[in-house]
């Protein structure tokens, strides 16, 4: 019985350790957080590529990538907007530092900066950006309409908000993540579109990859 008890305790500890590690998807912290940002950069690459294929970007655009994680999508934006400027924002210090590291050359050239900030109170003036992107992050946003309204505020007139999620809310298997990660909520495209409309977006296009249960939404101010 002692062996059984210690085995059960070990299983609980392992489960808790795994859950602690996956909490880093919400807010990367410490060494586990650094590791997670690198995993995000590689693990989300195909999704990001697909999401980016749904928009065309002006080469001189002013861009904000919210929830920038490890900074890989900042790098893609920089490549697409060679004469523009890209800002990354995340509420995790680890993510900010990792994104700065990955995009150090562009930061040195004055084409990029990465800031710590909260999407429910974006630290920028009205009508600052041509594009705002959110890859694999809206699951964790505290109140969609409020956060989407903030995105709407910082976008210029006819500015574009790109959302990209690898869970479309129709795959029961994805619910395991909401049990594992505190504060995570998976939305359907219908729910996202309703919140975007309420936040003041006018033209909203949805794209889906049914095979992978991916969704991408392009909303115009």
Give the ranges of each region predicted by the language model:
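A short acidic, Gly/Pro-enriched loop at the edge of an enzyme's catalytic core
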Residues: 120-131
């Amino acid at each position: 019985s002692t062996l059984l008890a210690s085995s059960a305790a070990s299983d609980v500890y392992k489960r808790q350790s795994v859950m602690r590690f996956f909490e880093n998807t919400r807010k990367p912290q410490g060494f586990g957080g650094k590791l997670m940002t690198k995993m995000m950069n590689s693990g989300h690459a195909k999704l990001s590529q697909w999401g980016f294929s749904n928009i065309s970007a002006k080469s001189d655009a002013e861009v904000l990538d919210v929830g920038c994680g490890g900074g890989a999508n900042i790098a893609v934006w920089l490549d697409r907007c060679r004469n523009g400027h890209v800002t990354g924002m995340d509420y995790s210090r680890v993510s900010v530092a990792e994104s700065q590291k990955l995009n150090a050359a562009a930061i040195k050239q004055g084409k990029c900066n990465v800031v710590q900030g909260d999407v429910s109170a974006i630290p920028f003036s009205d009508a600052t950006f041509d594009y705002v992107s959110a890859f694999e992050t809206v699951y964790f946003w505290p109140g969609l309409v409020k956060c989407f309204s903030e995105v709407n505020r910082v976008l210029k007139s006819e500015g574009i908000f790109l959302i990209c999620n690898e869970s479309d809310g129709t795959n029961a298997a994805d619910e395991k993540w909401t049990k594992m990660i505190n504060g995570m909520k998976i939305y359907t495209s219908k729910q996202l579109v309703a919140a975007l409309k309420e936040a003041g977006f006018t033209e909203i296009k949805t794209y889906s990859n049914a095979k992978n249960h991916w969704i991408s939404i392009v909303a115009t101010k």
